């Protein structure tokens, strides 16, 4: 006679068996699947699997927020950056000091990966999720909200959840002014000698670029159209942008505003 105790299913198990995301499984099990417009056939499949595999709500994904796992998540865009790695270290220290366990992951600035990562974290019943620099923070919110997961955006804001961000405009204004004043009166900087490299069409970059333009006009009296090279955050693409600039102008910029430390690295 087999004395082994059969392991009961978790939300993650049901996700694998049904081919549905953990958040979809959670919605079916907590009865909110109709609000999320999940097909009835999908709900029936998941409920059937839950019964067959002895799913019980007091196990892993009481991600329906009735129990606490002690896990706190931090989703970063990348790991290999001083800003984000420093944030991760500080985060881990604060979480551990509260007797909880930090879970740090990256989603590689990929909106689909951000949502998949959030779904996976939900399947492990994390208690909170800090979303840092997400490409699509509202997409992540749409995964977290139905599961009842507390979450907040850091660095880049979303429209559907609370956000904590830096004053990118004022920071860029101060930096642009400092660059200009560094040259003094003996060999003052001309408008066509100061360039901004890096960044893309996100909130932080838009604020920095707006301040860069405004400060150049205010202090230098002009702002040529080609003063901003939005080369994204990739160091390789930024390097190619520098090479293209050099080929076109025969020299490097006299003064340079780097939009992100990722570009500089």
Question: What annotation goes with each model-predicted range?
Answer:
Residues 129, 134-138, 205-265:
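Hydrophobic alpha-helical
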Residues 162-195, 206, 235-243, 264:
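Hydrophobic alpha-helical segments within soluble ligand-binding/sensing domains
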Residues 49, 90-94, 143, 207-219:
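Alpha-helical structural signal in soluble globular domains
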Residues 26, 132, 154-155, 197, ...:
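Conserved residues at the C-terminal ends of beta-strands
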């Amino acid at each position: 006679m087999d004395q082994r105790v059969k392991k009961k299913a978790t939300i993650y198990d049901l996700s694998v068996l049904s081919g549905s995301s953990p958040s979809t499984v959670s919605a079916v099990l907590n009865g909110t699947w109709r609000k999320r417009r999940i097909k009835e056939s999908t709900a029936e499949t998941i409920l059937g699997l839950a019964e067959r595999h002895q799913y019980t709500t007091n196990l892993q994904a009481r991600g329906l927020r009735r129990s606490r796992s002690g896990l706190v998540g931090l989703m970063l865009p990348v790991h290999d950056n001083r800003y984000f790695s420093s944030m991760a270290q500080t985060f881990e220290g604060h979480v551990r000091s509260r007797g909880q366990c930090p879970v740090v992951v990256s989603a590689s600035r990929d909106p689909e990966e951000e949502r998949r990562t959030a779904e996976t974290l939900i399947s492990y019943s994390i208690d909170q999720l800090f979303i840092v620099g997400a490409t699509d923070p509202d997409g992540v919110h749409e995964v977290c909200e139905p599961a009842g997961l507390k979450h907040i955006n850091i660095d880049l804001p979303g429209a559907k959840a609370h956000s904590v961000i830096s004053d990118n405009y004022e920071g860029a204004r101060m930096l642009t002014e400092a660059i200009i004043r560094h040259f003094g009166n003996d060999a003052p900087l001309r408008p066509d000698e100061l360039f901004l490299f890096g960044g893309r069409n996100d909130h932080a970059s838009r604020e920095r670029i707006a301040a860069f333009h405004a400060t150049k006009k205010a202090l230098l009296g002009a702002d040529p159209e080609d003063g901003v090279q939005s080369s994204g955050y990739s160091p390789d693409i930024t390097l190619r942008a520098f090479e293209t600039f050099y080929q076109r102008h025969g020299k490097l910029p006299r003064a340079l505003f780097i939009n992100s430390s990722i570009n500089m690295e």
